[in-house]
A protein has these predicted regions:
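Intracellular juxtamembrane helix-capping segments at the cytosolic ends
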Residues: 1, 182-195
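Helix-loop-helix hairpin linking two adjacent transmembrane segments in secondary transporters
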Residues: 9-56
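Small-residue (Gly/Pro/Ala) motifs that create kinks and tight helix-helix packing interfaces
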Residues: 17-29, 101, 133, 216-221
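Juxtamembrane intracellular "pre-TM" segments in multi-pass secondary transporters
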Residues: 56-83
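Extracytoplasmic gate region of multi-pass secondary transporters
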Residues: 80-119
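Helix-to-loop junctions at the C-terminal end of transmembrane segments
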Residues: 129-141
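C-terminal transmembrane helical hairpin of 12-TM major facilitator-type secondary transporters
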Residues: 143-187
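A late C-terminal transmembrane helix in Major Facilitator Superfamily
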Residues: 194-221
């Protein structure tokens, strides 16, 4: 019953990495070169790979699950509903994120240093959302999952209404950051619950669906 809270801690790490990684790599690319920024990525990923080998314990396997048994979860209607939901929600979130800087620059008309600060606020709010998600899913997962798309929809509409006012925009983006953190946990929970008999395959489908949504969302937006 504590699984949602444990997963939320993992997403906190992911969000923290984005909060720190985006400004650091942007700085390296602008002040040194794009090649050095890519080298930074390489070194960071290599360190994570080594740390995973050294510090992450092997997960005990209760019973071996065949490839056929894992693929059979794709016959479940709930799995496909979850895959579609993850693709659409992640597409919406990253579609918005892909043009947020441009929107702040052209519509809200704020300088780039302020945009960087707003992006930092969004990232930090994302971490808060991750922490909240674990508690919300533990209390009432169904309610959290059902309400989230509507909360995102209302927030996106508010962006267009208050787009010219920086103060209001910061508040809405702060709320969106929290909602995005909650939504990320909700999406993983949906797919994991749809296929509890094949957790590794379910996690793979979550990442595939999320990446597909990111690709479609950023391309369309």
């Amino acid at each position: 019953e504590q699984a949602p809270k444990a997963v939320s801690k993992v997403f906190v790490g992911v969000s923290a990495g984005m909060v720190l990684g985006v400004p650091v790599t942007s700085f390296i690319a602008s002040e040194v070169s794009f090649s050095m920024a890519m080298l930074f990525f390489t070194v960071a990923n290599a360190l994570v790979f080594v740390a995973t080998i050294l510090f992450i314990p092997s997960m005990p396997v209760k019973e071996k699950v065949s490839y056929g048994a894992q693929l059979s979860v794709l016959k479940k209607t709930t799995m496909w509903y979850s895959i579609i939901a993850v693709t659409l929600i992640n597409g919406a979130m990253f579609g918005f994120f892909s043009y947020m800087s441009d929107y702040l620059k052209k519509v809200t008309e704020v300088p780039y240093n302020v945009i960087s600060a707003v992006l930092l606020v969004y990232g930090l709010a994302n971490i808060v959302g991750n922490v909240m998600a674990g508690k919300l899913l533990s209390i009432n997962a169904k309610r959290s999952i059902i309400l989230m798309p509507f909360a995102l929809l209302v927030s996106y509409i508010c962006l267009f209404i208050v787009g010219e006012w920086i103060g209001a925009m910061v508040i809405v983006i702060l709320i969106l950051g929290v909602l995005a953190g909650i939504a990320s946990n909700n999406m993983q929970y949906m797919i994991a619950e749809a296929a509890p008999e094949a957790p590794d395959f379910a996690n793979g489908m979550f990442l595939t669906s999320a990446n597909l949504g990111t690709t479609i969302g950023t391309a369309v937006c």
